[in-house]
Regions:
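Nucleotide phosphate-binding/pyrophosphate-handling subdomain across enzymes
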Residues: 1-46
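Glycine/aspartate-rich loop-and-adjacent alpha/beta segment that forms the canonical ThDP
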Residues: 102-118
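Short glycine-/acidic-enriched loop or helix-start segments at secondary-structure transitions
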Residues: 7-8, 34-36, 59-60, 108-111
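C-terminal helical cap/extension that packs against the catalytic core
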Residues: 35-96
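Cofactor-binding loop segments of dinucleotide-utilizing enzymes, especially the Rossmann-like FAD-
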Residues: 26-30, 50-52, 101
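Alpha-helix N-cap/helix-start capping motif
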Residues: 1-4, 81, 103
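Active-site catalytic pocket residues across diverse enzymes, especially alpha/beta-hydrolases
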Residues: 14, 67, 91, 113-117
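Generic beta-sheet signal
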Residues: 22-24, 95-99
């Protein structure tokens, strides 16, 4: 989900996801309605605010400030990879980890996962 229409559908699925804790790695780009999307996000999740590598990315600090204004709690990360790794480090087996907000966030994660680590 990278726009309000997509999040109306997706947020219902995330909210009803059976799990111990929801972890959401989230970032958006500057041509999307971030406030309307954040109104749809679950309040009971832990957020990992991030930004994609595109020049269109909203800085993760700004995303975090918007999140806080909507009652969403999380920490700021300077890359999708660092946010994802933090979520995995905290998550336990019955938790749910979601990565999204923008297709660019997902793209950065896929690039990270495809890069061999030394």
């Amino acid at each position: 989900g990278h726009n309000v229409g997509g999040w109306k559908y997706l947020s219902k699925q995330i909210i009803h996801q059976e799990c111990h804790q929801k972890h959401i790695v989230f970032g958006m780009v500057d041509d999307k309605d971030i406030d309307s999307v954040m109104e749809l996000l679950p309040k009971d999740a832990i957020y990992y605010w991030s930004q994609a590598t595109t020049h269109r990315a909203i800085p993760s600090q700004v995303v975090a400030q918007k999140g806080l204004a909507h009652g969403l709690v999380g920490r700021v990360y300077d890359s999708v990879e660092s946010a994802y790794m933090a979520a995995l480090a905290i998550a336990v087996p019955n938790d749910f980890v979601f990565i999204g907000g923008s297709s660019y966030i997902v793209s950065d994660l896929l690039a990270c996962l495809a890069t061999p680590k030394e």
